[in-house]
């Protein structure tokens, strides 16, 4: 059921996701899609939610942006994703970063990992793609008593007249079925998901940051999104990309562009 308090129709977004394959975007995804920034990991450590030596599972890990950040904090991390091309890119990025992460092909709803094996389970920028009740149940199964779940987002913010709003309008012209426009980066329904899975001590946190993008990088970031190369064929993606390049030159010529983003998370603890 759609949550009327939520800015995006997450049911429609998940239905749209049935035709999305991020594996098709793996190169752009790894090169241009900004991962969670340092402010996100600082938030986790400042709140005492992570610590060296903990065991973590990162669901829907993609190219490893959250997993790598956790590994850099001294956690033992396993990343789970259904798209093997993204895991291949993640391993390349790990080598460059000098961290070691275990990756397994699987889904958030059925990871195949042992029960009560994780101190921390994370899901970054992906919860809306899952069968949420099943994924939340899997989170509870994976956590040790006292373990913590963190569902996080790093969303661009479409504001009147800004490049994000113009880009979203262009995506919709090329892909009218895309359900990801108009977001605020806040997802209150995720708290209900965690509560229904038995987690308590629920909290949210957020911080707004600006992410710099050149024209080339923004085009790559948008190609890597669900509404473009992950769901359009190569020819339609190329046409879209050319129009976006022209739009940026015409309406947003200054580089780098400052793209407003919101870090937002929901977290809860499995009772001991």
What are these regions (language model features)?
Residues 125:
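Short catalytic micro-motifs in class I SAM-dependent methyltransferases
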Residues 55-57, 63-110:
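Class I SAM-dependent methyltransferase SAM/SAH-binding core
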């Amino acid at each position: 059921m759609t949550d009327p308090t939520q800015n995006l129709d997450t049911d429609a977004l998940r239905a749209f996701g049935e035709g999305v394959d991020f594996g098709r975007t793996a190169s752009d995804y790894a090169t241009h899609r900004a991962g969670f920034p340092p402010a996100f990991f600082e938030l986790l450590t400042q709140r005492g939610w992570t610590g060296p030596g903990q065991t973590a599972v990162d669901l829907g890990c993609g190219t490893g942006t959250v997993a790598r950040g956790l590994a850099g904090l001294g956690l033992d991390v396993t990343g789970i994703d259904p798209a093997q091309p993204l895991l291949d890119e993640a391993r390349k990025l790990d080598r460059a970063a000098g961290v070691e992460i275990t990756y397994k092909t699987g889904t958030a709803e059925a990871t195949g990992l042992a029960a009560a094996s994780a101190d921390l389970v994370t899901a970054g920028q992906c919860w809306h793609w899952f069968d949420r009740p099943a994924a939340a149940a899997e989170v509870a199964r994976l956590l040790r008593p006292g373990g913590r779940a963190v569902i996080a987002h790093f969303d661009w913010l479409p504001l009147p007249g800004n490049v994000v709003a113009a880009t979203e309008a262009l995506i919709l012209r090329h892909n009218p079925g895309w359900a990801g426009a108009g977001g605020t980066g806040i997802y209150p329904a995720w708290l209900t998901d965690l509560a229904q899975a038995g987690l308590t001590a629920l909290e949210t946190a957020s911080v707004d940051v600006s992410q710099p993008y050149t024209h080339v990088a923004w085009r790559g970031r948008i190609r890597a999104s669900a509404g473009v190369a992950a769901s359009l064929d190569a020819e339609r993606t190329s046409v879209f990309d050319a129009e976006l390049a022209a739009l940026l030159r015409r309406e947003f010529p200054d580089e780098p562009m400052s793209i407003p983003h919101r870090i937002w998370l929901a977290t809860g603890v499995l009772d001991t």
